Design a protein with these regions (language model features):
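Catalytic domains of riboflavin
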Residues: 2, 7-295
Length: 295
């Protein structure tokens, strides 16, 4: 077995394992009494795939639902507008996991909670303004990027895109929201496989060729959770989506969201990521020659 095929198999197995856990272990270790208190005060609630609130009993019975914690006031540096944070996780087979968490707590296996938490893909929603007053809000669905968003890497433009999206939404008269998709690292292949693709890119392949060399899709992101959250917060309103990727618009439309206006979002172009962005342009992203600083 070659190194590439071994990495590819490991990445696929990792994704399947995460998906299994994602579908079965999503909302774990909050103590039942605290959970009830949060539910009573309306800070813990569930929505279905159409963005409608549902009662907790229905959520516990299974199905494609999402549990949400919020709103949580979140002061952000460089932001004068008030921002409210919602933490969001899938909610299938919740009862079994809560029982497991209760058992771990009773047996004082505190270290096991970190293991459970490591498999939870907790997405976030950052809301600027009052959704009840929105008419055509500005929205960014942002895929997690540890290297760009956290480390400030210039191999991509993700960090500047995230920061600028918040600034643009803050300055927009309608306000809006950012949905941060924590399971989308490396366009859905995960951080480990993404690191391998970086090495392949340094050997001459572009970002999509590197994925294919590992036997992985060009883009394996799932936007179904983002669509449900948009249905909840935007509630049937038209909205503007900050993206250069028409496929993202198509994916959301296929999940039942209509009346989306794509808004160009070019920022953070440097010599370090121009080749990467050129590959995106070739793949279908709406980037002009001027956007990439080419003559």
């Amino acid at each position: 077995m070659t190194v590439k095929s071994a990495i590819a198999k490991a990445a696929i197995a990792h994704r399947k394992f995460r998906r299994m856990l994602h579908n079965s272990r999503m909302f774990t270790y909050i103590d039942s009494t605290v959970r009830q208190r949060l539910t009573t005060q309306g800070s813990l609630f569930q929505i279905d795939r159409e963005g409608a609130r549902i009662d907790s009993a229905k959520a516990r019975s299974g199905g494609a639902t999402i549990s949400m914690l919020g709103p949580i006031p979140l002061p952000l540096c460089d932001m004068h507008a008030e921002v409210e944070w919602y933490a969001c996780v899938r909610n299938t087979e919740l009862g079994k996991i809560e029982e497991l968490a209760d058992d771990l707590r009773a047996e004082n296996h505190q270290q096991s909670f970190a293991t459970l938490a490591s498999f939870m893909a907790v997405n976030s929603v950052l809301v600027v303004g009052d959704p009840k007053t929105w008419r055509d809000p500005l929205v960014r669905v942002h895929s997690c990027c540890m290297t760009g968003d956290v480390f400030g890497s210039e191999r991509c433009e993700c960090g500047p895109q995230m920061k600028t999206a918040l600034a643009r939404i803050q300055d927009d008269e309608q306000g809006g929201l950012v949905i941060y998709m924590s399971g989308h690292e490396g366009r859905g292949i995960g951080l480990w496989a993404k690191a391998a693709t970086y090495l392949l890119q340094d050997a001459g392949e572009d970002t999509y060729q590197a994925n294919r060399s590992l036997g992985l899709p060009d883009d394996s992101r799932d936007f179904s959770d983002a669509a449900a959250l948009l249905k909840y917060f935007v509630d049937g309103q038209p909205f503007r989506l900050l993206t250069n990727n028409p496929k993202k618009v198509d994916d959301l439309a296929a999940l039942g969201l209509g009346d989306i206006t794509r808004v160009k979002h070019v920022v953070g172009v440097t010599d370090n990521n121009r080749r990467y962005l050129t590959a995106k342009q070739d793949w279908g992203h709406k980037l002009d020659v001027e956007d990439l600083g080419k003559e």
